[in-house]
Amino acid sequence: MGNIFEKLFKSLLGKKKMRILILSLDTAGKTTILYKLKLGETVPAVPTVGFCVETVEYKNNTFAVWDVGSHFKIRPLWQHFFQNTKGARSPGSTHQGSLASGVLPIKCSHVEFGMWKGGRSHPFLPHSSRCAGSGGQLDSILPHQSPAWGPWGCKDLSSGFPSFLTSSILWKSAVVK
């Protein structure tokens, strides 16, 4: 009987735990965004070799954020990072065409974009950095009506502006069940 009340109490007041991937091409700002979320400040970063994992707590949510390296030898392994993932974030510069020409085909070739193990759809939040107003360019790339995608959103951001990062975290926690 005590277990029932404990589960009920945790479900009502407990923290929501989510695993989030940050995937993109080289030097797109993945590590900068991760540490801006974790520490609240920009730190000098070097290219990620392999992956980096940090736990970020925001309001009533706990995010295990995975910054996955994007060297061409690592990209085929991206599919393995999607297990038990509640969503993905993809920073990139659409000015350089990285989202359209690099990241989207890579992800689509390894998993149904927006689909993870078990056929469940999850939120995907592409971020567009270094080019103001470029989020509109993603509207022509990403299918709005595909039931396989689940909810998705796009935010133009710079890792130097924490309000954009926190609004994306709030969006993620709102759409993830």
Swiss-Prot record:
Location in the cell: Golgi apparatus
Broad class of the protein's primary localization: Golgi
Residues that bind GTP: 24-31, 67-71, 125-128
GO MF annotations, alphabetized: GTP binding; GTPase activity
Keywords per UniProt: ER-Golgi transport, Golgi apparatus, GTP-binding, Lipoprotein, Myristate, Nucleotide-binding, Protein transport, Transport
Organism domain of life: Eukaryota
Gene Ontology CC terms: cytoplasm; Golgi apparatus; plasma membrane
InterPro entries: ARL17_C, P-loop_NTPase, Small_GTPase_ARF, Small_GTPase_ARF/SAR
Gene Ontology process terms (BP): intracellular protein transport; vesicle-mediated transport
Lipid anchor positions (N-myristoyl glycine): 2
Functional summary from the UniProt entry: GTP-binding protein that functions as an allosteric activator of the cholera toxin catalytic subunit, an ADP-ribosyltransferase. Involved in protein trafficking; may modulate vesicle budding and uncoating within the Golgi apparatus.
Similarity annotation: Belongs to the small GTPase superfamily. Arf family.
UniProt name for this protein: ADP-ribosylation factor-like protein 17
Upper taxonomic lineage: Eukaryota, Metazoa, Chordata, Craniata, Vertebrata
